């Protein structure tokens, strides 16, 4: 086992703080409508330009092991916020840095770290309660467009496309973002269905960058039982190979010898193939397989219907324009099913929704209806260069998550103002001791950080902006960094999803609390490089 280096107390916290500052300082320049770009070097291809906080955070790795630990813990804030809300990663990073800095000062002055953390947690709970109480439900499409525009760094075109996509496929519909082949950004709504089952083996992946399987114009075999050997499937497999089309197998499971054979065939290039598990369980699985069969004009291969696998012919297989399979979900786009049959099926599901008395069953039936009737919206992001397209696609992804979050939990005034206004919730907190009160005050100061940073990125003085905002008590009164004007932020369209603001604060406080209560750090000692050996015969006189 390699020797370890151990740091304690203030020494450990100082090193960790340096790492936190490096990462946070690189990320926070991207905050707000006037946020700057960060350029990331790539070992191959053009450098990547981004304003996405989590993309910047993921690229940072420091040489000093202890500093790197601080940076990696802060990176966790951005990643977690990104996973839960899909946006707000830069805000979360700025908040975490502010809480850690204030917390470290308090610990250095002799306060109890555990009481500080309890105070921080009490304050965060109070602020979250205040945010939830003031969140406003989204009432129309233009508000969705405004949320999308703000999250896409003020790009109104992106906001418009997202609002249009959500209007067409509904809030529950599937929206995907792709790179366009042209310079124009466009929206296309495709009939399709998505279910929550991914590929059974990563060897099926065809697009290594995105780790997903993309099958163009495939046949789809829908089988309700397990496949453990392929003997009975050989006739249909041979027919598919001769047709030159890819094949998607949807079955209860594909295991053992059958999966191994499919993987080997895929790797040898003889057969473009992928396999996924059937969605749902029990009777619901049968119904969902039937939905897929109707969507793709295929037949469910089921012994109940007297169809055996060895008797399957090509015309029993479903067809679709495209199938995209990721680690955890599968999307069937543009199935070959007839409109009359699809309409009949959706009418049948609607009738079942009317009849059912169980809330759970109703919810599941509505999910099936959305999948059959909702379709998939595809936003194709265009640009003049590859670098521009990638940067824009990052912003569209952020904006998509933000609009979904806004529909889920409502909206708040943007520009960091909602957090600033929620400070009043801290006045009524009762703490057990003075150290906890200091923990509450740490949060009181830290939640000004996003407003200050947005102002500084826009070339204004953060403390002056915060001072002016404090003069008014109206919850939605704030400073618009885009125009430099004060006023009602709802009216100006400067809004943030409540879920994004809430998640950013909770995740920041969670990781910052861990950093503040850290008393020792352990890392592997850097290896001493051995001196190079002396060349043979060096220094000899021949």
Curated annotation (Swiss-Prot):
The keyword Cytoplasm applies. It is an enzyme of class 5 (isomerase). ATP binds at residues 30-33, 51, 87-91, 415, 496. It is found in: Cytoplasm. It catalyses: ATP + H2O + a folded polypeptide = ADP + phosphate + an unfolded polypeptide. GO terms for cellular component: cytoplasm. PROSITE patterns: CHAPERONINS_CPN60 (PS00296). Pfam families: Cpn60_TCP1. Coiled coil: none annotated. One of its GO terms (biological process) is protein refolding. Signal peptide: none annotated. One of its GO terms (molecular function) is unfolded protein binding. Together with its co-chaperonin GroES, plays an essential role in assisting protein folding. The GroEL-GroES system forms a nano-cage that allows encapsulation of the non-native substrate proteins and provides a physical environment optimized to promote and accelerate protein folding. Belongs to the chaperonin (HSP60) family. NCBIfam families: GroEL, PRK00013.1, PRK12849.1, PRK12850.1, PRK12851.1. This is Chaperonin GroEL 2.
């Amino acid at each position: 086992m390699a020797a370890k280096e151990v740091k304690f107390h203030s020494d450990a916290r100082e090193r960790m703080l340096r790492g936190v500052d490096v990462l946070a300082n690189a990320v926070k320049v991207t905050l707000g409508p006037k946020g700057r770009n960060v350029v990331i070097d790539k070992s191959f291809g053009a450098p990547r330009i981004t304003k996405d906080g989590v993309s910047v955070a993921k690229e940072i790795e420091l040489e000093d092991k202890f500093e790197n630990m601080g940076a990696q813990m802060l990176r966790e804030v951005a990643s977690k916020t990104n996973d839960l809300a899909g946006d707000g990663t830069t805000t979360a990073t700025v908040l975490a840095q502010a809480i850690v800095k204030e917390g470290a000062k308090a610990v250095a002055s002799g306060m109890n770290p555990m009481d500080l953390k309890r105070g921080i947690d009490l304050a965060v709970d109070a602020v979250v309660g205040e945010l939830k109480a003031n969140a406003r439900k989204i009432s129309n499409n233009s508000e969705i467009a405004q949320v999308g525009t703000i999250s896409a760094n003020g790009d109104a075109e992106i906001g418009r496309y997202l609002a249009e996509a959500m209007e067409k496929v509904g809030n529950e519909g599937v929206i995907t973002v792709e790179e366009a082949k042209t310079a124009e950004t466009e929206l296309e709504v495709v009939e399709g269905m998505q279910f929550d089952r991914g590929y059974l083996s990563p060897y099926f992946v065809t697009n290594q960058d995105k780790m997903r399987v993309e099958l163009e114009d495939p046949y789809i075999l829908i089988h309700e039982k397990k496949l453990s050997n392929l003997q009975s499937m050989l006739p249909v497999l041979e027919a598919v190979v001769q047709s030159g089309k890819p094949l998607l197998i949807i079955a209860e499971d594909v295991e053992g010898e059958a999966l191994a054979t499919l993987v080997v065939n895929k790797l040898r290039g003889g057969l473009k193939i992928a396999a996924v598990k059937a969605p749902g369980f029990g009777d619901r699985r049968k119904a969902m397989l039937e939905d897929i069969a109707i969507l793709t004009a295929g037949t469910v291969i089921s012994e109940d219907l007297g169809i055996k696998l060895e008797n399957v012919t090509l015309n029993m297989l479903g067809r679709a324009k495209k199938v995209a399979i990721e680690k955890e979900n599968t999307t069937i786009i543009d199935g070959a099913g007839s409109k009359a049959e699809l309409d009949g099926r959706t009418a049948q599901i609607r009738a079942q929704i009317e009849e059912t008395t169980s809330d759970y069953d109703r919810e599941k039936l509505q999910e099936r209806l959305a999948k059959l009737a909702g379709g998939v919206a595809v936003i194709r992001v265009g640009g003049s260069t590859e670098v521009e397209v990638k940067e824009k696609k990052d912003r569209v992804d952020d904006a998509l998550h933000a609009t979904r979050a806004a529909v889920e939990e409502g909206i708040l005034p943007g520009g960091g103002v909602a957090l600033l206004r929620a400070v009043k919730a801290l006045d009524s907190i009762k703490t057990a001791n003075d150290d906890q009160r200091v923990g509450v005050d740490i949060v009181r100061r830290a939640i000004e950080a996003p407003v200050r940073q947005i102002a500084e990125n826009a070339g204004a003085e953060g403390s002056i902006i915060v001072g002016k905002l404090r003069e008014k008590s109206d919850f939605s009164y704030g400073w618009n960094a885009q125009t430099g004007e004060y006023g009602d932020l709802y009216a100006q369209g400067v809004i943030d999803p409540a879920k994004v603001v809430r998640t950013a604060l909770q995740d920041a406080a969670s990781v910052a609390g861990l950093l503040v209560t850290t008393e020792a750090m352990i890392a592997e000692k850097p290896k001493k490089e051995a001196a190079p050996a002396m060349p043979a015969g060096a220094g000899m006189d021949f």
